[in-house]
């Protein structure tokens, strides 16, 4: 996805620590941590609820670590973890036992429940100690705390900044840094003991048999020292309504329910207009605006309403490129890659295949080749789903600037949209697979930029055709120019991108500057379906490949075919499975006719649901690409983000694909063409078309009932 750390840098202890590797500090692992998110706040802890002073553990607000340690002891010992529960996306509950306390014997009799609730500026941690001992339990409870106000980029790089000095207050502690803010900790009831130097607060309790002791700790980041780049949405932004799914197979309904809970915590907005909501890309590394990620998440979630798409479009349009800047990658009309606070922007050590170099991204960075055409595609799709016409019309000027960038600036290598990092310290690869080795030949050689990615040509074609339709619909000029560009692009693509192996033809992942096809078989080809760039026979060839065992792991699509020399099921982009990548292919297959497309769609849906079950119905950013026949559940990718916006949004994309729902609110129609719904789906309610809730019911005999929607909307089956 974004700014990935290299293979040598990603090695670390499996416990989540950032231990020293062969090149120094390393990126912490995430797979054994419990996360809660209420953007711009997030917490990461062990399964026992403890935040120990190692790795990425802690409480973060605005990409700063407000707490780097939060450890509970009872009578000098840490409680023993029994279990935990994710409560929505922004809260956790941890259950533990106090070994050796209470009655003698092996049975535990003293328990601690720890409830963590995040808010946009911090968290409230509530503790309940229950005693089932026969006699009064006298206990001394302590919470040991630390704060380093480290930037998330430093933590990700494996650095361990020095802690700040604690100051005692009447009811807790505080830590301050004039440049980064004030962290305030308030305890209820007031602690009996505050050890300022050690960062410890403590209480003494006498707990009668069958009774409880309760206390709480509230933590807030105040006075950040610099204006926040993004904040929580306005309180009157209603959030998401969970679609209700009925099916003989329970997995899809459960995935939708928990995915929406994860999405709630990722909502953010700019301080100037907190009603324009977008989704942060993911926690912990990407809790901010990312052009590509935020666009795709909003696009996949259009069946839940167009409001998120509207906020995403406007937020990005306000930051659309206006000048030329090699350092930031900015160009007139270009949509940005990511935004960070100036003192928290990304700095990582990366590898280009031969040499280590510094990856240092500016606070506002435009190094993405695909966000610009995808912005146009999102505007068009949102219009079809019912985005108000006046709001669409207001965004036609930035749409025109996007298309001008596409034709005049982005399209320059043999007539294809391509990229190259001209700063020397930006992303070497600027598609969605942006790790250093993401674009490689079948024999494992790394391709050289400038590169024209296959899926980007599909986005560009779709954007040009969408732009033409939009300007015509609003009685504006320019449609012929965009259609001519699209036709030429399709002709060039057909002539240059297709390669063959023993199984037949498929599109290369990319073209190098001299036109050489980079011949790896990759999941990128799935993004071409439904864009309009391909004809029916070409779409069928791709559908067959997507269903093959080379790409289809049984848990979803591998990013790189298992037959490639560079395949590694636990690499970032060269063999792993990404839920959103698979969901995009599923959406394209739903728009492709023929038995091959249907078979591949059903298999990929089942694979994603199988994977979701293995992750407790909370799909991570990515996971291992091992074959389902070899494992009963997918292996986690150890540095994978969770929750992650487009992974969670994949659940809604699956639902829409199974329904085959394609609205055209401006045209007054909604098309439904369900794809072998049973056992995955029998009914769905709570979807939204044109601002109105709709429900779809499917019967075994093929009858389709569409309930609700705007007046005058005609059903096409």
Where are the regions that the model predicts?
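Short glycine/serine- and small hydrophobic-enriched flexible loop segments
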Residues: 299-303, 376-384, 462-472, 584-591, ...
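Acidic/polar, glycine-enriched structural segments that form the non-catalytic walls/loops
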Residues: 3-7, 111, 119-124, 131-289, ...
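Extended glycan-interaction surfaces of carbohydrate-active proteins
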Residues: 93, 98, 246-289, 315-365, ...
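Catalytic cores of secreted or luminal carbohydrate-active enzymes
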Residues: 640-679
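Extended, well-ordered alpha-helical scaffold segments
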Residues: 229-233, 251-258, 305-319, 388-408, ...
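Beta-rich accessory regions
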Residues: 132, 138, 208, 470, ...
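Alpha-helical support elements that line or immediately flank enzyme active sites
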Residues: 293-324, 523-536, 582-601, 605
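An extended acidic
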Residues: 2-109, 121, 134-136, 148-154, ...
